[in-house]
Amino acid sequence: MQPFFKFIRNMLTNIVLLLVGTALVLWGADKFTDGACGVARRWNVSELVIGLTIVAMGTSLPELIVSLFSSIRGSGDMSVGNIVGSNIFNTLVIIGASAMAMKIAVSRITLYRDISLSFGVAVVLFLMGRDGELSRVEGILLLGVFACFLYNLFAAERKNKKNQTEVSEQTKDIEPVWKLLLFLVIGVASLVGGGQLLVNNAAELARFWGVSESVIGLTILAGGTSLPELATSVVAARKGSNDLALGNALGSNIFNITLVLGLCNVISPMRIPLISTTDWAFLIGSNVVLAVCAITRMRLCRIEGFVLLLCYAAYLTLLFV
């Protein structure tokens, strides 16, 4: 009887920790979104720019940490697989779930600059990886793309601010900067910590229930490092912060390929793992599907969200065939 009671105790512990992790992720996403929106209004910066920079970088910390440590240990090929899977998840699941939660308006600048760049860096990674490895020179080139992206982003923002003649009265009612930054830090910590608890204990429960390691890896763990982006984008969409919801996912895509892989290659040139044609096709094609969904009515509704989620379901199905 003791092994049985030990099994039940362990399973209940995993369930409790999973619920705690879920609560931390949701609470962290709420605080992080409030902090990011407040910083945008306080500094008179658009939510799109905040989403593409601070929020995208903050929610991509799991990918950055995993990839950097993999490169330092000489397991760089793990980094590429992590980034490819994460970007497919970002485009299809995060934006799809956000559109299902609330209608998202798509600005022309988001369509023609951000979605196009997300598509472009995916193509660049594919072309760089055709020879089976990424060199330090290619890593430096990726970092250069990221630097150009940031420069153009803030240059366009400065131009927009010069065209504004009035300062919004809303800034008077915003929390002080130190409090907003505290929200950001606490939010990121809760997202990362809660995500770890959720993923680890969900994986343990899956093993208890006899789910195979491959299924755990392709579902729970693959989406695990993208949980912060998912929670933040869905919460932002429900709060009406469309630019923040889209900017977070697209910014993470750009950040993952240019900065994360760029840094990893500078630290340690890596070999590209045997990424299948299906993975490359969905990495690039997911951006095409998103662009088509967005350009038809310049907004993403439940229909478009369902299409994106359906594409991810098709991707998972193909992985098992």
Per-region residue spans from a language model:
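Hydrophobic alpha-helical segments, chiefly the membrane-spanning helices
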Residues: 2-321
